[in-house]
A protein has these predicted regions:
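Signature of dsDNA virion morphogenesis modules
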Residues: 1-152
Length: 160
């Protein structure tokens, strides 16, 4: 299951984080997938193939199907009841209030250097673009590594 876990849009807290400033190495060393940022509970899976594509951070999630909660969350993702992911990051190492980095609606700073700590599958994340994507025609999950599927996803004429 491929999730977009981050893009550079303004989050619900009013700030944004530049993808170019992301340090993904700490996460790659311990690629836990949590449910709703609950780090006091066992992970529900692990992240693989952590990568940056087109200004977004994508992670392939492998759910722990041997774990009851992991299996339950995997089922909800498979059936389309959960589609969102969220990054858990350490407090930014560098931020900027440079107006050139601000987007419309942005009230807070821009994090220019930050470290990814974990990723979570969650009902509602603070970045509304951090989603698993589904094809409107088939209601099946889009494989973000499939170029043709992305073309269909972005072709607005065929969505309605």
């Amino acid at each position: 299951y491929t999730f977009c876990v981050h893009d550079e849009s303004v989050n619900t807290y009013g700030f944004r984080m530049l993808t170019s400033g992301a340090n993904l190495e700490e996460y790659r060393k311990n690629p836990v997938v949590l449910y709703n940022h609950n780090d006091w509970e066992a992970p529900i899976g692990r992240g693989e193939n952590v990568r940056v594509e087109g200004g977004r951070i994508l992670v392939d999630v492998v759910f722990d199907e041997e774990d009851e909660k992991g299996r339950m969350i995997a089922g909800k993702v498979e059936r389309g009841f959960l589609r969102m992911a969220s990054i858990g990051a350490w407090p930014p190492e560098e931020v900027s209030d440079d107006p050139a980095l601000k987007l419309p609606g942005q009230t807070g700073p821009t994090a220019t250097k930050w470290t990814m700590r974990e990723m979570s599958v969650c009902p509602i994340g603070s970045n509304h673009n951090a989603l698993a994507m589904y094809d409107r025609a088939t209601n099946k999950r889009i494989d973000l590594s499939d170029g043709q599927a992305l073309v269909r996803l972005m072709d607005k004429k065929k969505q309605y």
